[in-house]
Protein backbone atom coordinates (compact mmCIF):
# COMPACT_ATOMS: atom_id res chain seq x y z
CA UNK A 1 0.00 0.00 0.00
CA UNK A 2 2.89 2.37 0.73
CA UNK A 3 4.22 1.88 -2.79
CA UNK A 4 0.78 2.73 -4.18
CA UNK A 5 0.66 5.86 -2.02
CA UNK A 6 4.12 6.92 -3.19
CA UNK A 7 3.06 6.69 -6.85
CA UNK A 8 -0.02 8.82 -6.15
CA UNK A 9 1.89 11.43 -4.14
CA UNK A 10 4.56 11.75 -6.83
CA UNK A 11 2.00 12.04 -9.62
CA UNK A 12 0.03 14.66 -7.74
CA UNK A 13 3.05 16.94 -7.59
CA UNK A 14 3.09 17.04 -11.39
CA UNK A 15 -0.67 16.81 -11.90
CA UNK A 16 -0.82 19.91 -14.11
CA UNK A 17 1.33 18.13 -16.70
CA UNK A 18 -0.65 14.87 -16.76
CA UNK A 19 -3.05 14.25 -19.64
CA UNK A 20 -4.86 11.15 -20.93
CA UNK A 21 -2.38 11.07 -23.80
CA UNK A 22 0.85 11.22 -21.79
CA UNK A 23 0.10 9.50 -18.48
CA UNK A 24 2.49 6.61 -17.90
CA UNK A 25 1.28 3.07 -17.33
CA UNK A 26 2.40 2.87 -13.69
CA UNK A 27 0.58 6.06 -12.75
CA UNK A 28 -2.58 5.14 -14.64
CA UNK A 29 -2.70 1.68 -13.08
CA UNK A 30 -2.12 3.09 -9.58
CA UNK A 31 -4.91 5.65 -9.92
CA UNK A 32 -7.29 3.09 -11.40
CA UNK A 33 -6.49 0.61 -8.62
CA UNK A 34 -7.22 3.18 -5.92
CA UNK A 35 -10.56 4.07 -7.52
CA UNK A 36 -11.42 0.36 -7.62
CA UNK A 37 -10.57 0.01 -3.91
CA UNK A 38 -12.71 3.03 -3.05
CA UNK A 39 -15.50 1.60 -5.19
CA UNK A 40 -15.57 -1.65 -3.20
CA UNK A 41 -15.13 0.00 0.19
CA UNK A 42 -11.74 -1.63 0.77
CA UNK A 43 -10.35 1.88 1.24
CA UNK A 44 -12.13 5.06 2.29
CA UNK A 45 -11.03 8.68 2.17
CA UNK A 46 -11.78 9.21 5.86
CA UNK A 47 -12.24 6.79 8.75
CA UNK A 48 -12.59 6.94 12.51
CA UNK A 49 -9.44 5.81 14.30
CA UNK A 50 -9.33 5.79 18.11
CA UNK A 51 -12.41 7.99 18.23
CA UNK A 52 -11.08 10.64 15.83
CA UNK A 53 -11.81 11.12 12.14
CA UNK A 54 -8.67 10.83 10.02
CA UNK A 55 -8.58 11.95 6.38
CA UNK A 56 -6.27 10.02 4.06
CA UNK A 57 -5.22 12.89 1.85
CA UNK A 58 -3.44 10.66 -0.65
CA UNK A 59 -6.71 8.93 -1.50
CA UNK A 60 -8.33 12.28 -2.14
CA UNK A 61 -5.39 13.10 -4.41
CA UNK A 62 -6.00 9.87 -6.33
CA UNK A 63 -9.61 10.92 -6.89
CA UNK A 64 -8.46 14.28 -8.22
CA UNK A 65 -5.87 12.63 -10.46
CA UNK A 66 -8.51 10.35 -11.96
CA UNK A 67 -9.94 13.37 -13.75
CA UNK A 68 -6.56 13.97 -15.41
CA UNK A 69 -6.13 10.54 -16.98
CA UNK A 70 -9.46 9.99 -18.73
CA UNK A 71 -11.08 11.59 -21.75
CA UNK A 72 -14.81 12.22 -21.83
CA UNK A 73 -16.76 9.29 -23.25
CA UNK A 74 -20.34 8.50 -24.10
CA UNK A 75 -22.18 6.52 -21.39
CA UNK A 76 -25.54 4.90 -21.88
CA UNK A 77 -28.39 5.48 -19.43
CA UNK A 78 -31.91 4.07 -19.29
CA UNK A 79 -33.52 7.17 -20.73
CA UNK A 80 -30.60 9.25 -21.97
CA UNK A 81 -26.87 9.32 -22.72
CA UNK A 82 -24.04 10.88 -20.72
CA UNK A 83 -20.66 12.33 -21.68
CA UNK A 84 -18.08 12.49 -18.89
CA UNK A 85 -14.64 11.42 -17.68
CA UNK A 86 -15.85 9.23 -14.79
CA UNK A 87 -17.73 6.02 -15.61
CA UNK A 88 -20.97 5.06 -13.88
CA UNK A 89 -20.63 2.63 -10.97
CA UNK A 90 -23.38 0.30 -12.15
CA UNK A 91 -22.48 0.24 -15.85
CA UNK A 92 -21.39 -3.40 -15.72
CA UNK A 93 -23.86 -4.68 -13.13
CA UNK A 94 -26.30 -7.47 -13.91
CA UNK A 95 -29.13 -8.75 -11.71
CA UNK A 96 -26.89 -11.27 -9.95
CA UNK A 97 -24.41 -8.60 -8.90
CA UNK A 98 -27.12 -6.25 -7.64
CA UNK A 99 -28.57 -9.10 -5.59
CA UNK A 100 -25.15 -10.04 -4.24
CA UNK A 101 -24.31 -6.49 -3.12
CA UNK A 102 -27.74 -6.08 -1.57
CA UNK A 103 -28.85 -2.50 -2.17
CA UNK A 104 -31.67 -0.89 -4.14
CA UNK A 105 -31.23 1.72 -6.86
CA UNK A 106 -34.36 3.55 -8.02
CA UNK A 107 -34.18 5.19 -11.46
CA UNK A 108 -32.71 7.63 -12.28
CA UNK A 109 -30.34 7.51 -9.28
CA UNK A 110 -26.74 8.11 -10.38
CA UNK A 111 -23.57 6.86 -8.70
CA UNK A 112 -20.09 7.47 -10.06
CA UNK A 113 -17.47 4.73 -10.03
CA UNK A 114 -15.26 5.12 -6.98
CA UNK A 115 -18.18 5.57 -4.58
CA UNK A 116 -19.02 2.75 -2.16
CA UNK A 117 -22.61 1.72 -1.46
CA UNK A 118 -23.12 -0.75 1.41
CA UNK A 119 -25.77 -3.42 1.86
CA UNK A 120 -29.38 -2.54 2.69
CA UNK A 121 -28.96 0.98 1.34
CA UNK A 122 -31.76 2.53 -0.70
CA UNK A 123 -30.93 5.10 -3.35
CA UNK A 124 -33.99 7.02 -4.46
CA UNK A 125 -33.47 9.30 -7.51
CA UNK A 126 -30.32 10.87 -6.10
CA UNK A 127 -26.65 11.49 -6.87
CA UNK A 128 -23.57 10.00 -5.18
CA UNK A 129 -20.21 11.36 -6.30
CA UNK A 130 -16.81 9.69 -6.66
CA UNK A 131 -14.98 8.83 -3.43
CA UNK A 132 -18.12 8.89 -1.27
CA UNK A 133 -18.82 6.14 1.28
CA UNK A 134 -22.43 5.28 2.11
CA UNK A 135 -22.73 2.75 4.92
CA UNK A 136 -25.33 0.06 5.67
CA UNK A 137 -29.04 0.72 6.10
CA UNK A 138 -28.95 4.29 4.83
CA UNK A 139 -31.68 5.98 2.81
CA UNK A 140 -30.59 8.58 0.26
CA UNK A 141 -33.91 10.17 -0.61
CA UNK A 142 -35.12 11.86 -3.78
CA UNK A 143 -32.86 14.60 -5.22
CA UNK A 144 -30.39 14.28 -2.34
CA UNK A 145 -26.72 14.71 -3.25
CA UNK A 146 -23.78 12.98 -1.56
CA UNK A 147 -20.71 14.98 -2.53
CA UNK A 148 -17.28 13.73 -3.50
CA UNK A 149 -15.52 11.80 -0.70
CA UNK A 150 -18.37 12.48 1.77
CA UNK A 151 -18.72 9.85 4.49
CA UNK A 152 -22.25 8.72 5.41
CA UNK A 153 -22.70 6.39 8.38
CA UNK A 154 -25.00 3.47 9.14
CA UNK A 155 -28.78 3.90 9.34
CA UNK A 156 -28.70 7.52 8.18
CA UNK A 157 -31.67 9.18 6.48
CA UNK A 158 -30.82 11.92 4.00
CA UNK A 159 -34.20 13.46 3.21
CA UNK A 160 -35.41 14.88 -0.09
CA UNK A 161 -33.15 17.51 -1.62
CA UNK A 162 -30.44 17.27 1.05
CA UNK A 163 -26.98 18.38 -0.02
CA UNK A 164 -23.88 16.83 1.57
CA UNK A 165 -20.86 18.79 0.39
CA UNK A 166 -17.90 17.37 -1.49
CA UNK A 167 -14.18 18.12 -1.41
CA UNK A 168 -13.28 18.56 -5.07
CA UNK A 169 -14.98 21.77 -6.18
CA UNK A 170 -14.26 24.00 -4.41
CA UNK A 171 -11.28 22.11 -3.02
CA UNK A 172 -11.73 21.27 0.68
CA UNK A 173 -9.23 19.85 3.15
CA UNK A 174 -11.54 17.29 4.77
CA UNK A 175 -14.74 15.57 3.68
CA UNK A 176 -18.16 16.22 5.15
CA UNK A 177 -19.13 13.44 7.57
CA UNK A 178 -22.55 12.28 8.76
CA UNK A 179 -22.09 9.69 11.50
CA UNK A 180 -24.31 6.70 12.31
CA UNK A 181 -28.02 7.01 13.09
CA UNK A 182 -28.43 10.61 11.97
CA UNK A 183 -31.43 12.21 10.29
CA UNK A 184 -30.97 15.18 7.94
CA UNK A 185 -34.20 16.98 7.07
CA UNK A 186 -35.38 17.99 3.62
CA UNK A 187 -33.43 20.65 1.71
CA UNK A 188 -30.77 20.99 4.42
CA UNK A 189 -27.13 21.48 3.42
CA UNK A 190 -24.08 20.24 5.34
CA UNK A 191 -20.82 21.25 3.65
CA UNK A 192 -17.14 22.23 4.02
CA UNK A 193 -16.03 19.24 6.07
CA UNK A 194 -18.57 19.68 8.86
CA UNK A 195 -19.02 16.60 11.07
CA UNK A 196 -22.52 15.71 12.25
CA UNK A 197 -21.94 13.36 15.15
CA UNK A 198 -23.83 10.16 15.91
CA UNK A 199 -27.55 10.23 16.62
CA UNK A 200 -28.13 13.85 15.66
CA UNK A 201 -31.32 15.15 14.06
CA UNK A 202 -31.09 18.07 11.63
CA UNK A 203 -34.42 19.75 10.90
CA UNK A 204 -35.63 20.79 7.46
CA UNK A 205 -33.86 23.72 5.81
CA UNK A 206 -30.78 23.93 8.05
CA UNK A 207 -27.55 25.12 6.41
CA UNK A 208 -24.23 24.34 8.11
CA UNK A 209 -20.72 25.19 6.88
CA UNK A 210 -17.45 25.78 8.72
CA UNK A 211 -18.34 29.41 9.48
CA UNK A 212 -21.89 28.69 10.66
CA UNK A 213 -22.45 29.30 14.34
CA UNK A 214 -24.02 26.25 15.98
CA UNK A 215 -25.59 27.63 19.14
CA UNK A 216 -26.52 25.39 22.08
CA UNK A 217 -29.41 27.17 23.76
CA UNK A 218 -29.09 25.13 26.96
CA UNK A 219 -25.45 26.00 27.61
CA UNK A 220 -24.86 29.11 25.50
CA UNK A 221 -21.89 27.40 23.88
CA UNK A 222 -21.16 28.03 20.20
CA UNK A 223 -19.67 25.28 18.04
CA UNK A 224 -18.09 25.58 14.61
CA UNK A 225 -17.68 22.72 12.14
CA UNK A 226 -19.17 20.08 14.43
CA UNK A 227 -22.66 19.11 15.57
CA UNK A 228 -22.26 17.30 18.92
CA UNK A 229 -23.65 13.78 19.24
CA UNK A 230 -27.37 13.51 19.94
CA UNK A 231 -28.18 17.10 18.99
CA UNK A 232 -31.56 18.19 17.65
CA UNK A 233 -30.84 21.17 15.39
CA UNK A 234 -33.11 23.77 13.79
CA UNK A 235 -32.38 26.96 11.86
CA UNK A 236 -32.36 30.25 13.78
CA UNK A 237 -30.70 33.62 14.24
CA UNK A 238 -28.41 35.27 16.77
CA UNK A 239 -28.47 39.03 17.42
CA UNK A 240 -25.47 41.28 16.87
CA UNK A 241 -23.75 42.75 19.93
CA UNK A 242 -25.54 46.07 19.54
CA UNK A 243 -28.86 44.43 18.69
CA UNK A 244 -29.16 46.27 15.39
CA UNK A 245 -29.35 43.12 13.25
CA UNK A 246 -29.27 39.33 13.46
CA UNK A 247 -27.39 36.71 11.50
CA UNK A 248 -28.27 33.14 10.60
CA UNK A 249 -27.19 30.30 12.87
CA UNK A 250 -28.08 26.70 13.60
CA UNK A 251 -29.61 26.15 17.04
CA UNK A 252 -29.24 23.02 19.16
CA UNK A 253 -32.63 22.96 20.87
CA UNK A 254 -32.13 19.76 22.84
CA UNK A 255 -29.99 16.66 23.24
CA UNK A 256 -31.32 13.12 22.99
CA UNK A 257 -29.79 9.73 23.69
CA UNK A 258 -30.25 6.47 21.85
CA UNK A 259 -32.92 5.31 24.30
CA UNK A 260 -35.02 8.41 23.69
CA UNK A 261 -34.57 8.14 19.94
CA UNK A 262 -35.76 4.53 19.99
CA UNK A 263 -38.98 5.50 21.76
CA UNK A 264 -39.75 8.82 20.07
CA UNK A 265 -40.24 9.44 16.36
CA UNK A 266 -38.19 12.01 14.45
CA UNK A 267 -41.21 14.24 13.90
CA UNK A 268 -41.95 14.35 17.62
CA UNK A 269 -38.36 15.29 18.43
CA UNK A 270 -38.58 18.23 16.05
CA UNK A 271 -42.06 19.38 17.03
CA UNK A 272 -41.47 19.51 20.78
CA UNK A 273 -38.61 22.00 20.89
CA UNK A 274 -39.90 24.36 23.59
UniProtKB/Swiss-Prot annotation:
Keyword Lipid biosynthesis attached: no
Main localization, broad class: cytoplasm
EC annotation from Swiss-Prot or TrEMBL: 2.3.1.117
GO process terms (BP): diaminopimelate biosynthetic process; lysine biosynthetic process via diaminopimelate
Places the protein is found: Cytoplasm
Alphabetical list of Pfam families matching this protein: Hexapep_2, THDPS_N_2
Organism superkingdom: Bacteria
Enzyme category, top tier: transferase
Protein residues bound to substrate: 104, 141
Gene3D superfamilies linked: Hexapeptide repeat proteins, Tetrahydrodipicolinate-N-succinyltransferase, N-terminal domain
Pathway: Amino-acid biosynthesis; L-lysine biosynthesis via DAP pathway; LL-2,6-diaminopimelate from (S)-tetrahydrodipicolinate (succinylase route): step 1/3
Record keywords, A-Z: Acyltransferase, Amino-acid biosynthesis, Cytoplasm, Diaminopimelate biosynthesis, Lysine biosynthesis, Repeat, Transferase
Assigned GO CC terms: cytoplasm
SUPFAM superfamilies per record: Trimeric LpxA-like enzymes
Keyword Transferase among record annotations: yes
GO MF annotation: an example: 2,3,4,5-tetrahydropyridine-2,6-dicarboxylate N-succinyltransferase activity
CDD domains reported for this sequence: LbH_THP_succinylT
InterPro entries on file: DapD_Trfase_Hexpep_rpt_fam (IPR005664), Hexapep (IPR001451), Hexapep_transf_CS (IPR018357), THP_succinylTrfase_dom1 (IPR023180), THP_succinylTrfase_N_sf (IPR037133), Trimer_LpxA-like_sf (IPR011004)
Subunit structure: Homotrimer.
Family: Belongs to the transferase hexapeptide repeat family.
Name of the protein: 2,3,4,5-tetrahydropyridine-2,6-dicarboxylate N-succinyltransferase
Organism, scientific name: Yersinia pseudotuberculosis serotype I (strain IP32953)
